A protein has these predicted regions:
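Activation on extended, non-transmembrane soluble regions of large proteins
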Residues: 1-155
Length: 155
């Protein structure tokens, strides 16, 4: 469970407590009725919406960051090509020690920027992995809570 996302997970224990309190009632013989069903389904829908909205926001954020990284890579590649073309034109297409040093500096700068992008992508991969676990855990919670609800038993 990702601690920072805790409030976005299904409130399984809260839903289960609510089920138990509605089933037992004051006299311990209360039958599950339409009011109980309606209230439980409303709470279940609220939980589902909470989880869904969080997932959608995280997915949008991940895609946005991927797009930004893709754009950065495209710009780096274009800048590298442009800079090398300009260097070769300025030096009259001659390859010399000075030109090689400038190429090495340019390559080092580009390599450093690529490493930054790689680090960003590693974080995104971890976020995708965490989101996958989040989805699986919530799915399991929804399946379990609907199986133990009286409406599932009565059906």
């Amino acid at each position: 469970m990702v601690t920072e996302w805790a409030r976005n997970y299904i409130d399984y224990s809260g839903l289960k407590k609510e089920l138990k309190s509605r089933q037992s009632g004051a006299d311990k013989t209360k039958e599950w009725d339409d009011v109980d069903e309606s209230h439980f389904l409303k709470r279940l829908q609220e939980e589902l919406s909470k989880v869904y909205n969080f997932q959608e926001a995280k997915i949008a954020s991940i895609f946005s960051q991927l797009s930004e990284n893709d754009q950065s890579v495209q710009e780096l590649m274009e800048n590298k090509k442009t800079a090398k073309d300009e260097e070769h034109q300025a030096s009259g297409q001659a390859e010399g020690d000075e030109s090689d040093d400038e190429d090495d500096e340019l390559d080092a700068e580009i390599e450093a920027k690529f490493e930054e992008i790689e680090a960003d992508l590693e974080i995104l991969i971890a976020d995708v992995h965490d989101l996958s676990k989040f989805t699986h855990l919530n799915y399991t919670g929804f399946v379990k809570i609907t199986k133990v609800s009286p409406s599932a038993v009565q059906s």
